[in-house]
Regions:
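Metallocofactor- and cofactor-centric catalytic cores in central/energy metabolism, strongly enriched
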Residues: 1-313
Length: 313
């Protein structure tokens, strides 16, 4: 019933999809799709990029406005798909695991193959210092630890407090980075090298019936051809998690998936449907109908009845 549908942990069984295993983990017949090629940029480290962009990565949120101004002011040269600032509110006043997680995510952005060149923008007083961050970027680059932290002109580091005119210096750096990247050319690469990121479909009334099903079939076609697909927003997997678990390549991956689901979906401070209604649904309804007191009272009364001791099947 609705009262006991969710608990602190959920139990799952490792029942591999025999059809998928027998096919060598090809969920669908590819019918030659695996032989197709795409046009992409081959990076010096061997990775492929779909776009040839210049990225501005702030080490700290304090320079977000500077990053945005530089991205909006710089003139995009021929051969460059765009200049983008990846702003965020982090990089300072963080400690321990939170601080390291921020640094790791930002370093991986700098090393992303869609970024033909990168301007790393720091302030100077943040605890994610430009100097230490450059070392992390080098250690996490595909070339491995000890590689040139400027990656032969691909990365420029700018600390705004060390500059008398950070706008002029930033624009000059972006100009150099574009000169470095504008001669990159697309070439034919195998579809198997493609990495696709999935995004939430909006969670409307039809996404689980139409859009998600179609996207799933597309993912099957690509992964069966050797491509990689990354699923995001783990709570959206709720209800289909056992199906995904049945595709785990081994018991170890299955166990990690179960832990992920239990940690991010079920194992929260709100662990029953009644509590979800009380602490999540009701506030949302109140937000949208608070201007209509009569309608609000009717909704609240209905939900109060719904979350009573009565079982709902």
């Amino acid at each position: 019933n609705m009262k006991t549908l969710l608990s602190e942990t959920a139990e799952y069984s490792y029942t591999p999809d025999e059809k998928v295993i027998a096919s060598g983990y090809k969920a669908v017949e590819t019918n030659g799709f695996e032989n197709k090629t795409i046009k992409a940029y081959r990076r010096p480290n061997g990775k492929i990029g779909i776009r040839n962009e210049i990225w501005i990565v702030p080490t700290v949120g304090c320079v977000n406005k500077l990053a945005e101004r530089l991205a909006n002011t710089a003139k995009v040269k021929d051969g460059i798909d765009g200049i983008h600032a990846w702003i965020h509110p982090y990089g300072c006043s963080q400690m321990g695991g939170d601080h390291e997680q921020t640094r790791t995510v930002l370093a991986d952005l700098v090393n992303h193959p869609n970024a033909a060149a990168v301007l790393v923008l720091g302030l100077g007083c943040e605890n994610n210092t430009v100097e230490k961050f450059a070392e992390l970027v080098a250690s996490r680059s595909p070339e491995g630890e000890g590689s040139d932290i400027t990656q032969k002109g691909r990365i420029i580091y700018l600390t705004s407090q060390n500059s008398t005119d950070e706008i002029a210096d930033g624009l000059a750096a972006l100009d150099k980075l574009q000169d470095f990247a504008c001669n990159n050319k697309r070439e034919d690469v195998s579809i198997s090298e493609l990495v696709i990121g999935m995004k939430c479909g909006g969670s409307d009334g039809l996404s689980g019936i139409t859009a998600n099903a179609l996207v799933g079939q597309i993912c099957d076609r690509f992964t069966s051809s050797g491509s990689k697909v990354m699923l995001t927003e783990v709570p959206e997997m709720f209800g289909a998690e056992q199906m995904l678990m049945n595709r785990c390549i081994n018991k170890s991956i299955f166990d990690k998936t179960v832990d992920l689901i239990n940690k991010l979906i079920v194992g929260t401070s709100i662990d029953t449907v009644s509590e979800v209604l009380e602490y999540q649904v009701k506030p949302i309804i109140a937000q949208y109908v608070k201007q209509h007191e009569v309608l609000y009272n009717a909704f609240y009364s209905a939900l109060s009845n719904f979350t009573s001791e009565r079982d709902v099947k």
